[in-house]
Structure formats: structure tokens, C-alpha cells
């Protein structure tokens, strides 16, 4: 059922995967990614835990009549940053399982 090496080999692979996942999670937590909107007029930087670290707003947007547009741009930049962090996490997770013999249909926990 488990092929060469049996269940012992499977357990060894699981231990290796767990170690790699922990390392990857530590790396991702340290990452900072910047999302943008309005062609770079609004930038939001978040870390791997999706905590907002910085918001940058181009001074040209700081006019009273454009409050709603500015709010929309901030939300869009935050969503862009979150999408970028999620993509980075998926790429790193794919590298963790690369080369391991996982059962068909097995999905990573994230």
C-alpha cells in the first residue's frame, strides 16, 4: 500500500514536511508586501500575518472633495497587498511539498 519503505518512509516524509512548513511560516511572517492602487497613488504594506505596517498616500489625493475616492483606493491597495501575500504563501507551500510522495488528493493544510 505504501510502496518501498512502507509507513516508516511516510512518517519520515511527514516529519520533513512539518519542519519545512514551520520554516516557511517563519519566513512568510517576516515578509512585507506592498499593494498599490490608483497607479501607485496609494500604497499599503502588510506583513505575512496580514497586519498593516504602512500606508502611503500621494499628496495629490489629499483634497476634501475626494474623500470617498481615497477610501476606495486604500481598500483596493489593502486587498492587492493581501492577494500578493496569499500568492507568496501558496508558492512557498508548493515548494514545501515538492518532491514528496503524497497520496493522491492530499491537500496541504493551508
From Swiss-Prot:
Entry similarity comment: Belongs to the YbaB/EbfC family.
Keywords: Cytoplasm, DNA-binding
Region: Disordered, residue numbers: 90-110
Bridged cysteine pairs (disulfide): none
Protein name in UniProt: Nucleoid-associated protein YPO3121/y1061/YP_0808
Quaternary state and interactors: Homodimer.
Function: Binds to DNA and alters its conformation. May be involved in regulation of gene expression, nucleoid organization and DNA protection.
GO cellular component: bacterial nucleoid; cytosol
UniProt subcellular location: Cytoplasm, Nucleoid
Entry-linked Pfam families: YbaB_DNA_bd
Record has Cytoplasm as a keyword: yes
Source species of the chain: Yersinia pestis
A GO molecular function held by the record: DNA binding
Amino acid at each position: 500500500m505504501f510502496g518501498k519503505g512502507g509507513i516508516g518512509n511516510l512518517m519520515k516524509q511527514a516529519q520533513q514536511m512539518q519542519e519545512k512548513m514551520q520554516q516557511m511560516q517563519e519566513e512568510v511572517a517576516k515578509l512585507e508586501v506592498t499593494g498599490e492602487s490608483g497607479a501607485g497613488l496609494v500604497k499599503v504594506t502588510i506583513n505575512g500575518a496580514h497586519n498593516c505596517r504602512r500606508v502611503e498616500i500621494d499628496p495629490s489625493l489629499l483634497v476634501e472633495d475626494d474623500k470617498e475616492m481615497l477610501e476606495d483606493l486604500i481598500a483596493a491597495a489593502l486587498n492587492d497587498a493581501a492577494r500578493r501575500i496569499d500568492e507568496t504563501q501558496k508558492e512557498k507551500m508548493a515548494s514545501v511539498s515538492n518532491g514528496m510522495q503524497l497520496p493522491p488528493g492530499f491537500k496541504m493544510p493551508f
